């Protein structure tokens, strides 16, 4: 099955690089997981403001999109710890298309080729104007800053541990977005991902909100935000809900921190986020709490947080706009008189899955990454992480407190 996926990835990439038909392209850089940017509309004739003009050809555009990320890693820990050793795999291989239409309409369809069966990641219809936007279909809900950032633009191989542990993901529903100056708010009503919409009677339902303020002061750009999530799991999560996270890698199935199966009926998540960029430097931090509500049992509360800082060794900067970090455009790319963009990042990553009589473990992670972006569509990442566990889900010779070291490299190409 893996061979079939690799063959599909290679064939698709070869077609898009060498044989794809001519398509319309936008000059505006767009983070891969952002909603679709619409082409500029023609300005009406000032002398006849009420006259209607035919839609221009630029109002209809179709753009293929794809990415491939390949990871190679080594995981070490105490003797006898499962999951250690050398690892390599395709992290992501996605192919999709963006369609922009007249009257502010747009659509996106994208698939992930590495899953079995192949899954849809984005599948939605969008309408927008200068301040408002409505999205219908499978999409990113109102998520933490680290998850809102495209996986093409994150600082490390994976996002913060709480993002995967608390189950932040794409879901099916309808959302509304409003922007006014430096302030924005968005909210949505959702159910499960498309692949799980097999029985309406057992589907979960949720309400999600996110707001942020992103002012500019002198030469520094700031971001302050908050988010809220309420979810009724219905029959979806009864006696099967687990909160757990992998060790700073997605290409391993081993998890050293995780709760037992819990009979969760509803859950709430609260989050705070902050970030700033000034020239070559950036900082970002988030804190999130998850409260799991159970029938006739104590309601545990779990916590996750991270803080990171980064600096470019070249004359580049990390864009912070629209409530997320955008793609890096090297000031002097390879082939354009330079070496591309080189960035160094440090992060502290904390996850606490202990609450009352529930012991899921604690993780304190210390991570460093070096990222080389020779051109906008290419990236090479190197990462080292030391993860310190206590009350770990997996014991080694009866010991549940130990450290794991993770060394990983990722090659990435996108279009």
Predicted regions located by residue number:
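Short, intrinsically disordered low-complexity segments
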Residues: 1-3, 29, 40, 46, ...
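Cleavable N-terminal export/targeting peptides
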Residues: 1-43
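Intrinsic disorder/low-complexity detector
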Residues: 7, 29-30, 34-35, 47, ...
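Outer-membrane beta-barrel pore domains
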Residues: 27-38, 57, 81-82, 239-415
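Outer membrane beta-barrel
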Residues: 51-234, 303-306, 311-336, 343-345, ...
């Amino acid at each position: 099955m893996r061979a079939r996926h690799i063959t599909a990835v290679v064939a698709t990439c070869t077609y898009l690089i060498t044989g794809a038909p001519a398509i319309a392209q936008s000059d505006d850089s767009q983070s891969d997981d952002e909603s679709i940017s619409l082409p500029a509309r023609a300005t009406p004739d000032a002398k006849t403001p009420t006259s209607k003009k035919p839609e221009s050809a630029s109002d209809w555009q179709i753009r293929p999109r794809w990415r491939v990320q390949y990871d190679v890693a080594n995981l070490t820990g105490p003797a006898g710890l499962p999951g250690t050793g050398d690892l390599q795999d395709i992290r992501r291989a996605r192919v999709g298309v963006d369609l922009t239409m007249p009257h502010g309409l747009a659509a996106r369809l994208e698939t992930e080729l590495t899953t079995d069966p192949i899954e849809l990641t984005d599948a939605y219809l969008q309408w927008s104007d200068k301040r408002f936007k409505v999205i219908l279909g499978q999409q990113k809900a109102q998520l933490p800053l680290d998850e809102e950032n495209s996986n093409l633009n994150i600082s490390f191989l994976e996002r913060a541990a709480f993002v995967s542990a608390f189950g932040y993901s794409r879901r099916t529903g309808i959302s509304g977005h409003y922007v006014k100056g430096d302030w924005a708010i968005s909210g949505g009503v959702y159910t499960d991902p498309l692949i799980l919409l097999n029985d309406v009677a057992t589907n979960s339902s949720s309400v999600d909100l996110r707001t942020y303020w992103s002012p500019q002061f002198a030469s520094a750009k700031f971001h302050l935000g908050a988010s809220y999530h309420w979810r009724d799991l219905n029959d979806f999560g009864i006696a099967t809900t687990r909160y757990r996270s992998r060790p700073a890698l997605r290409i391993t199935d081993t998890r050293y921190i995780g709760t037992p199966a819990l009979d969760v009926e509803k859950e709430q998540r609260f989050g705070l986020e902050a970030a700033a960029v000034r020239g070559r430097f950036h900082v970002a931090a988030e804190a999130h709490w998850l409260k799991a509500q159970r029938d006739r049992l104590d309601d545990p509360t779990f916590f996750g947080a991270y803080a990171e800082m980064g600096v470019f060794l070249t004359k580049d900067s990390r864009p912070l706009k629209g409530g997320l970090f955008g793609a890096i455009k090297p000031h002097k790319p390879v082939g354009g008189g330079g070496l591309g963009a080189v960035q160094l990042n440090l992060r502290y990553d904390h996850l606490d899955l202990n609450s009352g009589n529930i012991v899921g473990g604690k993780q304190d992670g210390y991570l460093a990454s070096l990222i080389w972006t020779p051109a906008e569509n290419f990236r090479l990442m190197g990462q080292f992480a030391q993860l310190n566990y206590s009350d770990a889900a997996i014991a080694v010779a009866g010991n549940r407190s130990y450290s794991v070291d993770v060394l990983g490299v990722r090659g990435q190409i996108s279009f």
